[in-house]
Amino acid sequence: MSFSAVTKGELARIYSKDRCCQLAELAALIRMCGTLQLVGGAQKLNIKLTTENPAIARKLFKLFKDLFGVHIEVMIRRNPRLRKNNHYLMVVTHGMGSTDILEKVKILKKEANSFDISYGVPLMLLQNRCCRRAYLRGAFLGGGSVSDPEKTYHLEFVTHSHEHSESLRDLINDFQLTSKIVERKGSYVVYLKEGDQIVDLLNIMEAHSALLELENVRIYKQMRNDVNRIVNCETANLSKTVDAAIRQIENIEYIKNTVGLGYLPENLREIAEIRLEYEDATLKELGEMLSPAIGKSGVNHRLRKIDEIATKLQEGKIKN
């Protein structure tokens, strides 16, 4: 099961005891996964809702029953050729009070002889912070998804209304987040791409298990990146050390074969002889072999002097 499906399963099991939050969540669910169907004339509407998640279907059934005393029928549709998940179809008819429900969730405003549909987030239902959290939970259940954090950080809500996408973005950003909107194939996508912001939104929607899973993945990925960075740094440093040692030995050999090591001052000759004898020794180890011992910086200084002498010999600035 995908991370997104697991997250939705967790959110679908959350059921608020407060009627105001139930209404806010149902309003979002109808807006995101519902369609309105005109039947028998302009004054009659059906609400059709579809989902692939059985837990969401159960939640819709319970919300309609608890809020409006409506027992909706859940029909299961499956296309065996496509081998996809079941589709759960629910219909609230005009006779079951669909118009009244749409008015209660602030999607529909009934005029004398017509309907006025509201496409924005119903702010009248979201006076309390808990209701705003419930609305976001319903919006995610109805039209949201979150990517597998092992691959990328991305959470989105897909809606067909530009007005709704803007008000949904504003609602999310009221929680100090920075969601954005992009148009995709005729729909509007409200999205977050930062891992810490997705964690915050999961917390707002109360998907605590999904939040912990995402945090664990983030910590693991950070540790892996840190280890890789350290290994790369140490590898680069080791490569520089090896290259320097090879250069030092080549220069000492050049001096030895041209003017002889006796040409060097005693302090340089001593370190040159030890460098030739202990090719794999570190600067610290070379310094400890001298008498008296000197530190890494002292060893490095002497070896650089030897490099300069070898260069001058090669350039003919010192006569053999």
Curated annotation (Swiss-Prot):
One record GO biological process:
cell division
Gene3D superfamilies listed in its UniProt record: Homing endonucleases
Asked whether the keyword Metal-binding is assigned, the reply is no
- Pfam families associated with the record: HTH_WhiA, LAGLIDADG_WhiA, WhiA_N
Q: What's the domain of life for this entry?
A: Bacteria
Could you list this entry's UniProt keywords, alphabetically sorted.
Answer: Cell cycle, Cell division, DNA-binding
Portion annotated as DNA-binding: 282-315
- State a single Gene Ontology molecular function: DNA binding
Role, per record: Involved in cell division and chromosome segregation.
* Family membership: Belongs to the WhiA family.
- What is the official name of this protein in its record? Probable cell division protein WhiA
Q: Which organism is it from?
A: Alkaliphilus oremlandii (strain OhILAs) (Clostridium oremlandii (strain OhILAs))
